[in-house]
């Protein structure tokens, strides 16, 4: 992957230093663990800085590949239904664990960026296997999560893999197609979750204590932690 525009202002610049290497070393020097926080599918959320020619997403766009989709506001995302996109994400995680002394790989709560059926209609027609679109999309995310977990453990057993799903469990399942119950109910998906429960105790829709109890109740496998 090319260097981020956030470092120099231009994506793909050659850097005289390795920011991730420095961050990991400085964290460990101070007795801190270092978790690499990633958005697995999101290239950009909206119209912004241009992608460099070496960015895999730009190559997919140029070739007309279904490994990416674009949203009306200029967002660019890897398509969870694309085998090519899954491999890219898994190999990217593998590269981090292999080359850096990170303590964990940690995914943010963004999975499918839209419920629009047009973003993967051809992939669904070819690979849906009789499942509903929603069930097929959840299967795609589950496949990626499971393969990332396996890649992390194959590289370094001590490195943990966790996810911070959205605090609203219904939105996770119905809108983001994130099947958190499967991740927590079966071995081989995650070591922990840290749900983003940004709600007060008296929230009318998602009161903190109730949501926390719901997430905790999904854990059916010994050794999976809830933070």
Language model regions located:
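Aromatic-lined carbohydrate-binding/catalytic grooves of carbohydrate-active enzymes
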Residues: 1-15
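Active-site-adjacent "subsite" loops/lids of carbohydrate-active enzymes
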Residues: 13-25, 35-36, 41-99
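Catalytic domains of carbohydrate-active enzymes, especially glycoside hydrolases
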Residues: 1, 99-104, 186-193
